[in-house]
Amino acid sequence: FKPNSTYYYQVKLNGEWQQAQEYKTGDPDNFSFMFVGDPQIGSSYKQKNAESNGKKLGNDLAARNDSYNWNVTLNKAMEQHPEIDFLVSPGDQVSVKGNEDAKDLKEQEDQYSGYLSASVLRNLPQAVAIGNHDCSSASYQNHFNNPNPFLEESTPTPAGNGYFYSYGNALFIVINANNYNAADHKALIEKAIKENPNAKWRIVVMHQDIYGSGLDHSDSDGIILRTQLTPIFDANDIDVVLQGHDHSYARTYQLTSDGQAHDEFLEYKQDQGGFNHDNFDERFEKDGVFRAYYKSQNLCYNIADKSQGTVVNPEGVFYLTSNSATGSKFYNLIPEQQDYVAARSQNWRPSYSVINITKDSFTVNTYDVETGEVIDSSYTIVKK
């Protein structure tokens, strides 16, 4: 494909050609993408409303409602920001984990259908990570054709592998963080950089938020990877890490590794690269000494720059955690804001971010879906 060009394509369905669709390529020297968090179609199944007679919605109604809201989010985002060239998600496109159980797989497929039914996606490319709700079945691979899959991954999940791609002068490295073997992620990052040595911007996309501010994950299982990935990102000059998982918004200061050795808590890793959440959660809740030790080990970072607005040639990595793009599920913020957090928000409404990249700048703005109003102040990194 050539930059700044319009293409058309058609799909043949049941022997009939469908209506032609339009696809426009962007400007590699000045492009924008939409960053949306945890659409998680079907996750509202526990909610109650008049339609469900005060009972839980159930999977069918939840998938329908969440799909409708997903479509609204994408339509409003494109209306408000027609400059968007593609979409990035940190994972959890669906809610049912689909652990190869026939009933679960059927429900998961219904949710994928809802996710992919959004009309905007006929014309907008997307690059999505594998979330913890996506990782347990091969269904993800049936719906997304990812470039440059990291087949050398030693402990992939059933959903597949990490991958990478470039757009303009930016290299995007998409990690399957449900694999808790950090050596795999290190190898993927190094391979992607080796094949794209001239990329000015190095961006990692992953599901688990190792520097978030949500109550559900940011102080417990969500940071089990922090001690391992922080020095890897630092050593490979990663500029930005885009995260999800905590269904709340958070933006960090510029962070570096403290350069010290920290416990990797190997006893909670599973053979296939996963994480034993039940054993960890039980000990974390009941054992105060362990909880204090765990939190102390996760102080594995330094705050390199607290500047706001526009920062020029900053040290360290910038981490952004997205809130829910559909409103299917939200989490509270952790009561005490962590020292690495520059800004955070939970207004219980769907949101999305628009990220613009030029030859010299990376700028993020985050918006309320319904009103289009800015949720957080603009943040720009300039590299000269």
Task: Explain the meaning of each model-derived region.
Residues P3-T6, Q10-D101:
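N-terminal active-site segment of His-dependent metallophosphoesterases
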Residues T6-E22, K48, K55-D60, N99-R202, ...:
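Extended active-site neighborhood of metal-dependent phosphoesterases/phosphodiesterases
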Residues F35, S89, S166-Y167, I357-K359, ...:
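Generic beta-strand structural signal
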Residues F35-G37, F86-D92, Q126-N132, I175-N176, ...:
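Active-site neighborhood of phospho(di)ester-bond hydrolases with catalytic His/Asp-centered motifs
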Residues S43, S95-K97, C135-S137, N181-A182, ...:
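Flexible loop/turn segments at secondary-structure boundaries
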Residues P90-K97, N196-D216:
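Short acidic, glycine-rich surface-loop motifs adjacent to enzyme active sites
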Residues D110-A118, I224-D246, R349-P350:
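Catalytic-core region of carbohydrate-active enzymes that cleave or remodel glycosidic bonds
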Residues A170-L171, M206-I210, P335-S378:
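Extracellular low-complexity, Gly/Ser/Thr-rich intrinsically disordered linkers
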